[in-house]
């Protein structure tokens, strides 16, 4: 697709370099207050169109003495004279991608000539670069619009699902809203099946908007036949207006020693306590937790039986005894089929699963449940992948699965990432058809190796310098993007970077409202019944 340039020039390139970007002199006719950091512009070269982002603005004068005697408010003639001859503004412009005359996108490897004209990018340019939802081949999804524009910026959902992704931003910037938007796109476009660990009950049935008391639809409300709710607290789910599809109940046998490793920081357990847990497991196998909770009260006697230190047994018993207070944990299940088997059945049918925690919102509960379920699912997907590699039959190829976790730094900090299943999944990338979508306000708390495997990042406003450095680690043009991040509004703006988007882009995020709900409907369901009947017959 060829590009088209808007009629009114924004400015002209006067200097610059490939590594540092270009300097644009803002045109005299342009309104400087409409030239903003993060704005998407096109530089018209002879052979290429350079699509770029404005990263900084500077006021300039032709001679410093002009600043010694600035005109007063009433000196309009002098102001106009200076504006035409002596004062001007420049903008730092960073090229992100070029299009040749055939409309093919290429990396930036050259520079435009002096005085190349800079235009505001057009709607046609945006569609050429970022794709369109109407594309029948690629699974594009509209995430929002460029600053001061109305044309959709799309991400490639198939590429998004191929690698782990992240939604980052400080508290109150709308991370949950961005995630819900993204998940709705994945469900609508059938790009991947999702398993969502919903700690605060914000993705299933409904959720309250952060800015006011209004409620918005959850994924189950938008896609009733495509989303199932598994609940730890069925009473809480029913209070919000629906019965869960499955009530979660787990046995002590479902807990393995490695599941407890991720709780080391949360429980403040010494490494000797985990050594004791392994000793218990060596003797009691799958009944290790039941044995600890039954006999751990007499730590000295129990420690002698298994060859552990009494203080380690006592500490482990004290910390894990709270499991007995969780009503969804039982010593032995009353039936053979486990809830994880049922969950796998739903996922294999392409049904997205939201696990609601209800009133059980402690970090202990969230970490434990997420580890137990994800470990088992990952094992199943490893077996499925190995079978597919052996048979090479298309019907044996697993469907792509994306696991969604909040408070990701608690699963993926430098200690936990090397020991837990979530660190394994993040490092394996798409090897076994399982990826992560991590949501966090503290990306600096996530292990650096894991962060380097995050393919696509959707970043809302961040204020901590460590978090900014972490989220931009490994990104091209990191210095440029850091300036852009600093200019984001608190709400409804985000920076898209990475594997699923053609070039880094600042967007005004799509509004999650009645118009969005209608867009998510099946086209057949959105039309009147009589119209559908008339078309068929």
Language-model segments: residues:
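Basic- and hydrophobic-enriched, low-structure N-terminal and domain-boundary segments
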Residues: 1-168, 177-182, 395-397, 418-419
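Glycine-rich phosphate-binding loop of nucleotide-binding enzymes
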Residues: 138-231, 496
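Substrate-engagement module of ASCE P-loop NTPases
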Residues: 186-188, 376-382, 422-437
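Loop/turn-to-beta-strand initiation segments
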Residues: 191-195, 349-352, 398-402, 432-437
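Sensor-1/coupling segment of RecA-like P-loop NTPase cores
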Residues: 193-203, 208, 388-389, 429-443
């Amino acid at each position: 697709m060829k590009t088209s340039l808007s009629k009114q020039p924004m400015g002209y390139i006067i200097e610059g370099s490939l590594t540092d970007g270009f300097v644009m002199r803002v045109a005299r006719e342009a309104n400087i207050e409409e030239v903003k950091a993060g704005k998407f512009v096109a530089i018209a070269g002879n052979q290429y169109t350079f699509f770029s982002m404005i990263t900084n603005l500077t006021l300039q004068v032709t001679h410093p003495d002009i600043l010694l005697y600035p005109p007063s408010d009433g000196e309009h003639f002098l102001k106009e004279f200076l504006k035409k001859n002596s004062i001007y503004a420049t903008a730092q412009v960073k090229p992100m991608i070029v299009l040749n005359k055939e409309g093919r996108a290429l990396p930036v490897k050259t520079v435009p000539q002096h005085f190349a004209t800079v235009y505001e990018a057009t709607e046609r340019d945006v569609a050429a670069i970022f794709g369109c939802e109407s594309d029948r081949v690629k699974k594009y999804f509209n995430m929002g619009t460029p600053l001061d524009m109305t044309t959709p910026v799309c991400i490639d959902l198939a590429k998004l699902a191929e690698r782990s992704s992240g939604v980052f931003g400080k508290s109150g910037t709308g991370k949950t809203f961005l995630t819900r938007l993204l998940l709705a796109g994945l469900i609508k476009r059938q790009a991947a099946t999702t398993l969502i660990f919903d700690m605060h009950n914000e993705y299933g049935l409904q959720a309250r908007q952060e800015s006011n008391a209004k409620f918005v639809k959850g994924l189950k409300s938008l896609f009733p036949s495509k989303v199932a709710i598994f609940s730890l607290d069925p009473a809480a789910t029913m209070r919000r207006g629906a019965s869960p599809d499955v009530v979660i109940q787990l046995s002590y046998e479902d807990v393995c020693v490695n599941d407890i490793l991720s709780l080391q920081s949360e429980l403040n357990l010494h490494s000797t306590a985990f050594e004791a847990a392994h000793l218990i497991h060596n003797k009691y196998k799958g009944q290790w937790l039941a044995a600890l909770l039954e006999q751990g009260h007499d730590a000295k006697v129990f420690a002698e039986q298994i060859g552990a230190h009494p203080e380690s047994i006592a500490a482990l018993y004290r910390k894990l005894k709270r499991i007995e207070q969780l009503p969804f944990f039982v010593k032995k299940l009353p039936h053979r089929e486990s809830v994880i088997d049922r969950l796998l059945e739903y996922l294999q049918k392409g049904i997205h699963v939201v696990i609601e925690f209800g009133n059980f919102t402690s970090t202990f509960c969230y970490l434990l449940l997420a580890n137990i379920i994800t470990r088992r699912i990952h094992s199943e997907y490893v077996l499925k992948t190995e079978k597919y590699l052996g048979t090479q039959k298309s019907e044996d190829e697993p469907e792509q699965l994306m696991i969604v976790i909040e408070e990701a730094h608690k699963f993926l900090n430098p200690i936990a990432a090397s020991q837990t299943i979530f660190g394994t999944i993040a490092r394996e990338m798409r090897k076994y058809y399982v990826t992560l979508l991590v949501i966090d306000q503290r990306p600096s708390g996530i292990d650096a190796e894991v962060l380097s495997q995050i393919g696509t990042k959707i970043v809302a406003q961040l204020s901590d310098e460590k978090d900014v450095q972490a989220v931009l680690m490994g990104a091209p043009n990191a210095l440029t993007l850091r300036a852009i991040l600093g200019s984001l509004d608190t709400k409804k703006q985000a920076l898209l970077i990475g594997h699923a988007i053609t070039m880094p882009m600042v967007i005004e995020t799509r509004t999650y409202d009645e118009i969005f709900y209608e867009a998510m409907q099946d086209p057949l369901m959105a039309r009147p019944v009589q119209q559908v009947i008339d078309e068929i017959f």
